Amino acid sequence: MAEQLLDQVRDVAEGQIDFEGQKLVELLVNVTLALTGVVSFLVGYILQDIKLALQIGLAGTALTFILVVPPWPFYNRNPVKWLQVGGGLVPPQSLIVDEKSFR
Amino acid sequence: MLSGLANPRQAAVQLMNFGLILSTAFMMWKGISVITDSPSPIVVVLSGSMEPAFQRGDLLFLWNRNVLAETSVGEIVVYNVKGKDIPIVHRIVRKFGKGPEAKLLTKGDNNVSDDTELYASGQDYLVRNDIIGSVFAYIPFVGYVTILLSEHPWLKTVMLGLMGLVVVLQRE
Amino acid sequence: MYTSVVRLQNVFGFFTTVAFVVAAFIAASDFLTERAPIVRTLKTTSVQVVRGRPHYYSSKKEEYAVINFSLDADLSSLFTWNTKQVFVYVTAEWPAADHAKTNATNEAVIWDTIITSPSADHLANIGPVAMKKLRKSAGGKSIDPNRGKLSLKNQRHKYKITHPSGKLAMTDNVTLRLHYNVQPWVGLLTWDQDVDYGYWKALKNGVSKRFKLPAIKEKKPASAGAR
């Protein structure tokens, strides 16, 4: 019972997203943060206002966090289609596979 | 973690990696120390005596070589006083003479009086040797974490708790 | 596994990189802004040497030089978006006793002031009324180069100066010199310079005429609080 509950909590806390979602996240992080940096510098330099530059930078970063950290539904639109259980060969138990590529 | 225990080679690799990170950080610190000739080339501001120039938590980069000119009046220096652990960041306001024997007096921009009171008893002036570097570059705020952690020890507990939570909630 | 924790770490990691790069650009932008500070006048208006004690409980008598001055300077080009404050100070400089042999000098600050940028006004150590006035003076602008225009007439010294030997009267070849220290929000601290570097011009005319300290004025100073 407790194990099940913990599993549910883990599911929520983990916030998994699918492979396509991961690709999208990577792109979004790079684009939004880099854009934030460029915009904050240019606006700050042109208006000669360093406070505004700081605010733009922090706002853009906060936005990126909100956009990327929670497992929003649009990151889970392409769930992996696993093979049927018991359908094929059973891999040997002692085999150690690099965690990332295995999952 | 558990897989590391099951496989001693992997555990050893992890240990080596950890050691590598530590020794790299240490070597970089010592390398900068050698380049700047300062035992502590990067310091965090701990007091408000240089406000509004420096706030608590700001990061200062020090340079301790006199390549082109001697350390002179107007420079902001970090100095040690005999018998006191904490280095002080203040501005030189008087300099009498030249070379390693020159007498230097410092004062915090935000303080009413000069530092005579802060020096060791019987000491009226600093000499060049008391100084561990002149401030040449500045980054605001990033050192504040160290102040938070040293002044609010319960934050360390909170951080440990958070790390534990992450470990519990992560599947192996 | 690409979990929320991992994403949090990655975003934070890239954020620090971006913040560092932007900060480096801000610091570098200083070098593209012209600096041409000039001093129009810097001269003494009254020079005295008085006897006093270093502090109330001291029995030691020392000679103190009391120098008042006039200053007209334009440091407005030092104020850019990355300027946090400019520390302006006037020093008196005179040759040391062994000057002929070693070229050694003595130098002491007689007056200083902190000019904050509007972006750093909230940090200034002043009372609430003065703070209100200071903020109002910026008129909502993000930078206020006009603050760099200094016009002081017969400015009272802030620090009486002395010498470790306790002797100062009749010292010759004393000069006043204006200095400044630009404190950035991020990047390199810079001081007044004697030669031009790129867009940054040397401080012009920042030294006063040579003058001689007079003999001791035999009158007890109202307060011997020179420290």
Curated annotation (Swiss-Prot), chain B:
It is found in: Endoplasmic reticulum membrane. The C-terminal short (CTS) helix is essential for catalytic activity. It may be accommodated as a transmembrane helix in the thinned membrane environment of the complex, similarly to the signal peptide in the complex substrates. Keywords: Endoplasmic reticulum, Glycoprotein, Hydrolase, Membrane, Protease, Signal-anchor, Transmembrane, Transmembrane helix. Its EC number is 3.4.21.89. This is Signal peptidase complex catalytic subunit sec11. It is a single-pass type II membrane protein. It comes from Neurospora crassa (strain ATCC 24698 / 74-OR23-1A / CBS 708.71 / DSM 1257 / FGSC 987). The active site is at residues 49, 90, 115. The lineage of its organism: Eukaryota, Fungi, Dikarya, Ascomycota, Pezizomycotina.
